[in-house]
Amino acid sequence: MTRSEKVEIIAKLEEGFKASEAIVVCNYRGLSTKKLEELRNNARENNVKVQIVKNTLANIALNNSGKTGLVLKDTNIYLWGEDQLGVSKVAAKFEENNDKFEIKTAHIEGEVADVAKVKALAKMPSRNELLAMLLQVWNAPITNFTIGLNALKNKKESE
């Protein structure tokens, strides 16, 4: 790889890392190409970027984008995106289904996070699920009131 190619890779990573709310670093050693393609497809559906990069290049891009503190060793695959829940869910779900895939560390909301935090975020409901729950709570009193009025109307009609 030439120096200009490395500079280009660093620039693309830096741009992606700056725009991201979450970066998850995982070990992928031993995964087949088919499994990696499955991970990429899942990530693409959730607007999550996935890339395997040399640690030295990733470290430079992370430091340039202000995401410091991650210790990068061995083989790593990087997942990042604007939605921290989406990134966490993709990584945690894939780890559940694949023994050879392991979440190592993460950088979420400006600070280094451990595996437990990533898994905790993955269990949280998404924004759309939370909005649906909120709408259910708001609609419940109106629905119950309407049911009560209909029951009263039916009772009056039957008399």
Curated annotation (Swiss-Prot):
Q: Which GO terms describe its cellular component?
A: large ribosomal subunit
- What biological process terms from GO does the record include? translation
Which keywords has UniProt assigned to this entry? Answer: Ribonucleoprotein, Ribosomal protein, RNA-binding, rRNA-binding
Keyword Ribosomal protein recorded: yes
Q: Which InterPro entries would you find in this protein's record? A: Ribosomal_uL10 (IPR001790), Ribosomal_uL10-like_sf (IPR043141), Ribosomal_uL10_bac (IPR022973), Ribosomal_uL10_bac_type (IPR047865), Ribosomal_uL10_CS_bac (IPR002363)
CDD domains this protein is in?
A: Ribosomal_L10
Enumerate the Pfam families for this protein.
Answer: Ribosomal_L10
Gene3D superfamilies for the chain: 3.30.70.1730, 6.10.250.290
- UniProt GO molecular function: large ribosomal subunit rRNA binding; structural constituent of ribosome
Coiled-coil blocks: none
Subunit structure of this chain's protein:
Part of the ribosomal stalk of the 50S ribosomal subunit. The N-terminus interacts with L11 and the large rRNA to form the base of the stalk. The C-terminus forms an elongated spine to which L12 dimers bind in a sequential fashion forming a multimeric L10(L12)X complex.
Purpose of the protein: Forms part of the ribosomal stalk, playing a central role in the interaction of the ribosome with GTP-bound translation factors.
Q: Which family does it belong to?
A: Belongs to the universal ribosomal protein uL10 family.
The record, for PANTHER family, names: 39S RIBOSOMAL PROTEIN L10, MITOCHONDRIAL
Full protein name? Large ribosomal subunit protein uL10
Where is the organism placed in the taxonomic lineage, from the top? Bacteria, Pseudomonadati, Campylobacterota, Epsilonproteobacteria, Campylobacterales
